[in-house]
């Protein structure tokens, strides 16, 4: 934009002076003249040549811009009107007399254009009707009746009215009743969300003779009673519905207020096991059904895992490696260290030590038959004094051939039971482990089981002898009969 020349100076060099027909009146103020210099469209001018020399060759000083502080206020109304939702869709409306100090009167000045926009005219027409809704032709008639200027005005104003009705958000179309006979077209009413905006726009005019429109009570449900309310805009916390001002949903408002009031409780009212950083924490007073999730500290969890791994290592070192799963030192790869604890609990109960299956009894009887004496059976079932003897004993059992195929599974069960009975003594020191002897109750139970098994074995041997004798007797009788024949 180049240097701006103040209005007090004349143009240089060309000798051309600009004089305006509209800006010579004494009623105009300096801000209007300043607006003419800010690249606004110039008024019609008359150009005539004068003889003049160059008065000043220096650049124009811009300090004169700070002298007038009301520069923006002079055209603030036009700027605000450009973003208002109630402005006219058609911008062909000339400046109205409302901008001057003279009041507007349609009866005294019938040829003067009214100071209202088309949206305000439509608003006044609809609000003046008893049903708060009008067709387009009735809006035309109301404007012509109250403002005689439009009787002789060009017909383009009707197009502006139709455009405002169809494109402006302040007006909406309503279905007509069957009882009404309005012909073609539809009824138009005021959108409740923008009614206050229309009222504010109408009150900006210095004089409007139809202020009684806003004081009359409405007679239909489409009318809206409250007028002394703050203007509505997108994002406001209030909205209108059937003439009443309502807040946003009560749940959101109540929860927000309670959260603000209980901020100190949220900071100090949690247990040390609740996650507070990086998580959304709720107050128990607001949400009684929601309970915080207790989280064990990381140090305690790591200590428990470390203890479990240490116990598994000691057990695996003290026990034979035959038939037992390998336990890794890494807790991620180890999935079996928890099974040893559960097996230990099962073996510690006396009922498990007393109860044994018939397969175990038969296996014990078979070992008695293989070894050939009761002493060997008892020495085999009793606990060894040292770990080396236990290892040798298990190796011997593995090398001995099994008579039947079912004995292999029973052999594994026996080894597992022996291993579980030995687990409680592993926690003791090595010297005590060597000197420790099995409890007397276990010895008595094993003796009783051995006696019952021997009794069963004797019964079986007796039955075998009887069957053999009967078979021999039958054979002898058959032989005698054959010899006689």
Swiss-Prot record:
Its main location: nucleus. Pfam families: Forkhead. At early cleavage stages, localized within the animal half of the embryo. At gastrulation, expression expands over the whole embryo excluding the future endodermal cells of the blastopore. During neurulation, expressed in the prospective eye field and in the neural crest cells. Strongly enriched in the eye vesicles at stage 26. From stage 29 onwards, expressed predominantly in the eye, the branchial arches and the vagal ganglion. At stage 38, expressed throughout the head with strongest expression in the head mesenchyme and the eye lens. It is found in: Nucleus. Residues 338-357 have a biased composition (Low complexity). Residues 1-54, 85-108, 316-357, 401-449 are annotated as: Disordered. One of its GO terms (molecular function) is DNA-binding transcription factor activity. It comes from the Eukaryota. One of its GO terms (cellular component) is nucleus. Acts as a transcriptional repressor. May be involved in DNA damage-inducible cell cycle arrests (checkpoints). This is Forkhead box protein N3.
């Amino acid at each position: 934009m180049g240097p701006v020349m103040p209005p007090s100076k004349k143009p240089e060099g060309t000798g051309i002076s600009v004089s305006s027909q509209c800006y010579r009146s004494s009623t105009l103020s300096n801000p209007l003249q300043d607006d003419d210099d800010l690249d606004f469209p110039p008024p019609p001018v008359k150009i005539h040549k004068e003889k003049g020399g160059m008065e000043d060759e220096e650049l124009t000083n811009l300090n004169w811009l700070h002298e007038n502080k009301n520069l923006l206020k002079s055209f603030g109304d036009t700027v605000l009107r450009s973003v208002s939702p109630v402005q006219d869709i058609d911008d062909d409306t000339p400046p109205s007399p409302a901008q001057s100090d003279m009041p507007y009167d349609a009866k005294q000045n019938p040829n003067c254009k009214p100071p209202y926009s088309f949206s305000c005219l439509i608003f006044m027409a609809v609000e003046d009707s008893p049903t708060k809704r009008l067709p387009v032709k009735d809006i035309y008639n109301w404007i012509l009746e109250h403002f005689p200027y439009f009787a002789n005005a060009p017909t383009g104003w009707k197009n502006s009215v139709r455009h405002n009705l169809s494109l402006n958000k302040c007006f909406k179309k309503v279905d007509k009743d069957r009882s009404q006979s309005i012909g073609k077209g539809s009824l138009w009413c005021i959108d409740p969300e923008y009614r206050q905006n229309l009222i504010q726009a109408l009150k900006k005019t210095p004089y409007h003779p139809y202020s009684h429109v806003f004081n009359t009570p409405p007679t239909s449900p489409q009318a809206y009673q409250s007028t002394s309310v703050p203007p509505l805009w997108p994002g406001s916390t209030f909205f209108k519905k059937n003439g009443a001002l309502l807040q946003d949903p009560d749940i959101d408002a109540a929860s927000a207020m309670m959260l603000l009031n209980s901020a100190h409780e949220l900071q100090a009212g949690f247990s040390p096991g609740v996650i507070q950083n990086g998580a959304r924490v709720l107050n128990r007073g607001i949400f009684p059904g929601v309970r915080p999730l207790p989280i064990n500290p990381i140090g305690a969890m790591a200590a428990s895992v470390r203890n479990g791994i240490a116990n598994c290592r000691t057990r695996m070192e003290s026990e034979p490696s035959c038939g037992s799963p390998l336990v890794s030192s890494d807790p991620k790869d180890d999935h079996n260290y928890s099974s040893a604890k559960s097996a230990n609990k099962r073996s510690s109960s006396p009922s498990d030590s007393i109860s044994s299956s018939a397969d175990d009894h038969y296996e014990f009887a078979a070992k008695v038959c293989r070894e050939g004496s009761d002493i060997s059976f008892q020495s085999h079932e009793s606990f060894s004094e040292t770990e080396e003897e236990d290892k040798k004993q298990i190796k011997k059992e593995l090398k001995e051939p099994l008579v039947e195929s079912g004995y292999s599974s029973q052999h594994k069960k026996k080894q597992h039971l022996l291993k579980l009975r030995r687990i409680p003594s592993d926690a003791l020191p090595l010297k005590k482990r060597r000197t420790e002897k099995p409890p007397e109750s276990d010895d008595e139970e094993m003796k009783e089981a051995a006696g019952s098994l021997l009794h069963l074995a004797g019964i079986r041997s007796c039955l075998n002898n009887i069957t053999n004798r009967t078979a021999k007797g039958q054979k002898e009788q058959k032989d005698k009969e054959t010899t006689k024949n």
